Structures are given as structure tokens and as C-alpha cells.
């Protein structure tokens, strides 16, 4: 990973990146469907959602779907290749220029897909979102605070460190406060509206004089966190316990926060090596 020596900007996602938690998906779906569907249907839907997450269905992470027709598409470089219906049966391609395709990138995206399918009122979905996130900071469902990761990030020298999350305020800030990382990053962006938000950030970084090969983006959602930087010629790291049906060659890929800690350690080691080489020069 010689390219690590060239990195001067690191963009971190928050949810699914600085902590990993997949248990919330069950509670999120249950909160949306309770009082509208039977317990049996709720349980079946939760099972379906985890099967998608774990790659047990024809529909997988890394697929696109049409938010109106709820047809699914395997893809290469975000271009639809094959079409599937909700049951996972292959169907005729119906995508056109007007189709609004959504990338299934993470558990939050699976929950949004369920909300579409079950016709959950937006207000109910929003309340469930905030309620489940509030739970994630309580003792019963508490996310893991990986101080070893944050300490390793804080060791990075001569790097511009950015946290960009699509989570809005106040919940995004509440997670940052809980993780005690307010002093870890140079810039914070909440409600980042990725992927467009990260494209705009890249434009800003370019204006500041950074070159694409100096930028590393780390996240669990390929479409939101990685594709914009990858297409611009920058470096990317996918963090996900579960596989994505996506053939894109990211610069690095790790399955866990442990793997991310190892990557950041390598960055720190490469910085030390850089200083040694400069000293010899």
C-alpha cells in the first residue's frame, strides 16, 4: 500500500464506519411496522431484511432499485445489468433515463427499502429513525465506543481529517458527542447529502490545492462514500462485514473496525517512514 504515503486528506463516514452495529435493523423495521402489520408479517419482513444484508437472497447489497416500480438491478459501475422483481425472479429490463435508481448500500438503506415496500408514512419512518438512533446510545442497545480507533486517528500527522455523515442534526452530533470525537477531526459535515455532498467536498478540496491521489475516503456505503472519490481518481476503503455485489476495485477493503484500526496504523507507519526518508535526503 505505497499509496498511503501520498494521502493528505482522509474523509470518514460515521455510521457503520466509526462504529459497527447491525442489530438496530430489526428494531427499526419493527418500529415502522408496529400497529400496521401483524407480528407474523413483521417477523417475516425482518427475516427478509437480514437475508438481504447477509447475501442470502437474489437481491443483495450493491444492487440498485427503482423507487417507484421496486424493480431491482444488478449493476456494474452503477449501470444496470440484470433486472429482478421483489421475489428475486429475473425480469425484463424496464429501466430508462427517467428511472430514479437507489443503491442498496447498508442496513439503513435496507430499512428505507422496507418502508417503501410497506408504504410506511414518511412521518412514521422519520420517528422510527430518530427513536432507534436514540436507543443506540442507551445502555440496553449501546453502540461500541472504539477508543483504540480514535486514538490511532488522532496520531495522524499532517493530514486534513474530515467527518461527513448523512445523519442530520441533532442525532449526528449526539453520536459524535457520545463517541467523544469532537476534537478528532478538523471538519464536520452533518446531513451531508452524499453522494452529491462528497462531490461538492471534492470540488472544495481541489480548489484548496489537493490532488485526487492525495484523498482517501472511508465508508460502508459504496455509492455515498466511495464512488465519487474513486471516479475522481482518489483512494477508497470499504468497511463492511457483509459483501456487496459490486465489482469495483476499491483501494482497500476491511470487514471490521479492527481492520480499520490496522489500516490507520499503516498510515501512521507510512508517515514515520516518510520522515525517515526525508531525513536521509
What are these regions (language model features)?
Residues 14-19, 139, 166, 219:
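Short, charged/polar micro-motifs that form catalytic or ligand-binding hotspots
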Residues 35-49, 118-130, 183:
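Short, surface-exposed acidic
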Amino acid at each position: 500500500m505505497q499509496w498511503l504515503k501520498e494521502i493528505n486528506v482522509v474523509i470518514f463516514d460515521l455510521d457503520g464506519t466509526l462504529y459497527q452495529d447491525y442489530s438496530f435493523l430489526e428494531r427499526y423495521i419493527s418500529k415502522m411496522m408496529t400497529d400496521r402489520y401483524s407480528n407474523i408479517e413483521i417477523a417475516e419482513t425482518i427475516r427478509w431484511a437480514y437475508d438481504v444484508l447477509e447475501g442470502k437472497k437474489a437481491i443483495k447489497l450493491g444492487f440498485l432499485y427503482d423507487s417507484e416500480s421496486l424493480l431491482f438491478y444488478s449493476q456494474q459501475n452503477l449501470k444496470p445489468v440484470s433486472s429482478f422483481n421483489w421475489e428475486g425472479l429475473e425480469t425484463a429490463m424496464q429501466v430508462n433515463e427517467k428511472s430514479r435508481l437507489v443503491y442498496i448500500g447498508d442496513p439503513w438503506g435496507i430499512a428505507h427499502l422496507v418502508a417503501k415496500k410497506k408504504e410506511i408514512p414518511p412521518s412514521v419512518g422519520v420517528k422510527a429513525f430518530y427513536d432507534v438512533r436514540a436507543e443506540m446510545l442507551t445502555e440496553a442497545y449501546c453502540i461500541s465506543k472504539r477508543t483504540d480507533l480514535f486514538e490511532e486517528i488522532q496520531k495522524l500527522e499532517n493530514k486534513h481529517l474530515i467527518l461527513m455523515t448523512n445523519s442530520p442534526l441533532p442525532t449526528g452530533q449526539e453520536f459524535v458527542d457520545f463517541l467523544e470525537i469532537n476534537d478528532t477531526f478538523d471538519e464536520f459535515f452533518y446531513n451531508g447529502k452524499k453522494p452529491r455532498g462528497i462531490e461538492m467536498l471534492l470540488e472544495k478540496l481541489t480548489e484548496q490545492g489537493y490532488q485526487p491521489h492525495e484523498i482517501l475516503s472511508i465508508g460502508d456505503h459504496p455509492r455515498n462514500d466511495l464512488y465519487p472519490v474513486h471516479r475522481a481518481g482518489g483512494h477508497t476503503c470499504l468497511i463492511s462485514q457483509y459483501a456487496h455485489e459490486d465489482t469495483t476495485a476499491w483501494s482497500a477493503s476491511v470487514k471490521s473496525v479492527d481492520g480499520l484500526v490496522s489500516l490507520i496504523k499503516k498510515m501512521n507507519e507510512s508517515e514515520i517512514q516518510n520522515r525517515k526518508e526525508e531525513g536521509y535526503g
